[in-house]
Amino acid sequence: MIQLVLAALIAQEPPAAEVARLKVAHARVTQLGQTSGDSIWPGFRPDTIPVLYVLPGQGVLLLGWSGPAPEGFAPVAGGSWQPSTERGAASTGTELAGRPVAQVVVGAQTLPELVGLTVHEAFHVFRRLAKRENSFLVSSYPVFDAKNEAGMALEGRILAAAERARDRAAQRALAREFLAVRESRHRTLGGDLAAFEQLAELNEGLAEYALLRAGEITKEHPTFGDRLAGLDGLTADRTRSIRLRYYATGPAQAHLLDLLAGRSWKARLVAENLTLQDLLAEVSEYRRAEHDLRRQAEGAFAMRAIEAAADSGVGKLRAFRRSQVDSVLGAPGLLLVMTLEGRSLGMCGLDPQNLLQVDQGVLLHTRWVQLCAGDALQTTFNTPVVQDRNAGSVRAVVGADSGVRLTVAGQATELRDGSRLENATAVRLESPLFTLQAAKADISREGRVLTVRVKP
């Protein structure tokens, strides 16, 4: 029994040699962040981001955490330790005690590789609010399309050649070749999957760029040059996840932007919500002929006057739409105001010929619409409806007071001015102009305004 207890206690102790190695790796990341973080990416400070180093089957070492250690962690020199037999963790950006942290799974990495991986995951934390690719599209990506595979393989070889090129003219020419091949392939691939690739390059690709840029600064491997073989053979191992390809094409485009435009492109990419492909097209003058022709047309046809007329027309349209809403809601009869708590309101049926935009997020259904939310709500309107997606409300004049009927749990209920019903169940409202069925709702009446708050 004593031996078992001692074995359990020993198992809970952090492995001293590995902890020492991880502390060295983290110290290098800290120094890199303090001296060169902006050289990797504007505002990036990996030294300010806590790191969870996961030792599978042993425990988790937390370094760079400020303040008291989170619950379950015991102090060790320079950090905190939590024993664990968990083996299923992945390197990622995550949260601990409500704070963003980088998580690094420790295996057989060299010290420089650990530094790079820490920078990669810290960059994910730094960019955690950026738009991500729709990972579900992996399930429908055309992995058996040989033409798409060949196109992607060609893109990899062009990017590798651009990395090897030693003068800017050759780099710019190869960038244009890459874009021509990429855009041709993307036209066949379709908009959703093309966007998936470009967003994956911004997500995983830029994190990998940060890793390789760190290697370039510290003169440690891996560096951009170490990835040339991977670009040359981008599609060689077709058994691997396609997402891994963007770990190669993303940093390759980013480094090519470094070579062609210095480091100023990074701030623009964020400020203007661009993709790597967008910026590469600009700095390589890929669309120069298009831009020249557009400027020629704008001059020949007085574009400034056209823009002024468009601005005036849009302003008049916006004012007219608002007057339409005022007219619709000012019609005689009971005004229904409906909201839905805790979930989104869907359109189960609409008449596209009679659907008008009033403003950003505000719609006017001029004739007919069915709005729904699963079992919680079903409606049909045969009268104009104003749907405000920003406020989550629906407004419609639903007929004369005398023609609107309310039943609650199968019982007819009168709609008197000033009345209020809370948590009413099996609600049904109807008139010749609409029907509304809600599983649960609060209902109130003030003057001509009937408010229905549909509850989850």
PLM feature spans:
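Catalytic zinc-binding patch centered on the HExxH motif and its immediate surroundings
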Residues: P70, P75-G98
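Catalytic glutamate of the conserved HExxH
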Residues: L117, E121-L129, A207
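Short pre-active-site segment immediately N-terminal to the catalytic Zn-binding motif
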Residues: Q103-T118
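Sec-dependent signal peptide recognition
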Residues: M1-A7
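Active-site-proximal alpha-helical
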Residues: G191-H221, A229-R295
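N-terminal mature-domain "stem" immediately C-terminal to a signal peptide or N-terminal signal-anchor/transmembrane
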Residues: Q12-A77, A108, A207, L364-T366, ...
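Post-HExxH zinc-binding segment in Zn-dependent metallohydrolases
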Residues: P56-V60, L129-L189, L193-L228, T235
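Non-catalytic terminal regions of proteins
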Residues: K23, A27-Q34, Y247, A267-P456
